[in-house]
Amino acid sequence: MLSQLPLFAGGEIVRGFGRGSKELGIPTANFPLEVVKSLPESLPTGAYYGWANVDNGPVHKMVLSIGWNPFYNNKEKSVETHMLHDFNCDLYGQTLKICIVGYLRPERSFDSLESLIAAIRGDIEQAKAFLDEADKAKLKEAPFFTEKLCSSK
């Protein structure tokens, strides 16, 4: 249900399948399964946009995928975040915080890798425009991005 947006989540960045950078040219930061499972089950799978930061650093625009990535026939649900910023290092082990602001489209399979890449590039362009709107831009300043995450044990 999209009425739950904006939605905040955070956790350690873990290794994914390695497809984002290598196959797609669109690197992603991936959450561990426990963070994925902590998201509301009623949240539709698909592409979203919002804000993200790493280790309480600067907040950047982002797009993310929530789901099973039908093009790749994933067996487990994943959350893969692509920040619209070039990082010059691996982010594994660092803390990723996200604010999911809006929904772009449902997940689906694609006929080719090229059509998947084109769809993601379109998502990125839409996200840039939406996040420039004042009501969405203000979420970049949410205290969540500078607060320490508490782990539940």
UniProtKB/Swiss-Prot annotation:
Protein's GO biological process: FMN biosynthetic process; riboflavin biosynthetic process; riboflavin metabolic process
SMART domains: Flavokinase
InterPro entries listed in its UniProt record: Riboflavin_kinase, Riboflavin_kinase_bac/euk, Riboflavin_kinase_dom_sf
Reaction(s) this enzyme catalyzes, per UniProt: riboflavin + ATP = FMN + ADP + H(+)
Co-factor note (free text): Zinc or magnesium.
Cofactor dependency: Zn(2+); Mg(2+)
Sites where the protein binds Mg(2+): 28, 30
Localization (cell): Cytoplasm
Keywords carried by this UniProt record: ATP-binding, Cytoplasm, Flavoprotein, FMN, Kinase, Magnesium, Metal-binding, Nucleotide-binding, Transferase, Zinc
GO molecular function: ATP binding; metal ion binding; riboflavin kinase activity
Active site: 80 (nucleophile)
Pathway given in the UniProt record: Cofactor biosynthesis; FMN biosynthesis; FMN from riboflavin (ATP route): step 1/1
EC number: 2.7.1.26
GO cellular component, one term: mitochondrial inner membrane
Function: Catalyzes the phosphorylation of riboflavin (vitamin B2) to form flavin-mononucleotide (FMN).
Assembly and oligomerization: Monomer.
Family matches, as PANTHER family: RIBOFLAVIN KINASE, RIBOFLAVIN KINASE/FMN ADENYLYLTRANSFERASE
The protein's name in its UniProt record: Putative riboflavin kinase
Protein's organism: Drosophila melanogaster
Gene (name only): Rfk
